[in-house]
Amino acid sequence: MALTQERKREIIEQFKVHENDTGSPEVQIAILTEQINNLNEHLRVHKKDHHSRRGLLKMVGKRRRLLAYLRNKDVARYREIVEKLGLRR
């Protein structure tokens, strides 16, 4: 299921760095994580949906690049977002 505007607004409010923030790496990573989790649930039911699986892999790659960017730019912010989202177990 696609991410609703309401859910996206909630994520932005939770992870924004400053007022009117919608594009910071933290917000982008949080939104991608939510989409990845939704798509994972879809693929558990629809195992042969290879088109969606490719979209999932693209999203995971984009999130990985954003995490690498954030880690290089500010390690404290990187650790905080990883902790909040429960990534890197």
Curated annotation (Swiss-Prot):
Q: Name one GO molecular function term.
A: structural constituent of ribosome
A single cellular component GO annotation: cytosolic small ribosomal subunit
List GO BP terms, alphabetically. translation
Q: Which Gene3D superfamilies match?
A: 6.10.250.3130, S15/NS1, RNA-binding
State one Pfam family annotation. Answer: Ribosomal_S15
Which keywords does this Swiss-Prot/TrEMBL entry list?
Answer: Ribonucleoprotein, Ribosomal protein, RNA-binding, rRNA-binding
Keyword check for rRNA-binding:
yes
Is the keyword rRNA-binding assigned to this protein? yes
Q: Taxonomically, which superkingdom?
A: Bacteria
- Hey, which family's this protein in? Belongs to the universal ribosomal protein uS15 family.
Q: Oligomeric state and partners?
A: Part of the 30S ribosomal subunit. Forms a bridge to the 50S subunit in the 70S ribosome, contacting the 23S rRNA.
Function as written in the Swiss-Prot or TrEMBL entry: One of the primary rRNA binding proteins, it binds directly to 16S rRNA where it helps nucleate assembly of the platform of the 30S subunit by binding and bridging several RNA helices of the 16S rRNA.
Q: Write down the PANTHER family for this protein, in alphabetical order.
A: RIBOSOMAL PROTEIN S15, BACTERIAL AND ORGANELLAR (PTHR23321), SMALL RIBOSOMAL SUBUNIT PROTEIN US15M (PTHR23321:SF26)
Can you say what this protein is called? Small ribosomal subunit protein uS15
Q: What is the lineage of its organism?
A: Bacteria, Bacillati, Bacillota, Bacilli, Bacillales
The gene is rpsO
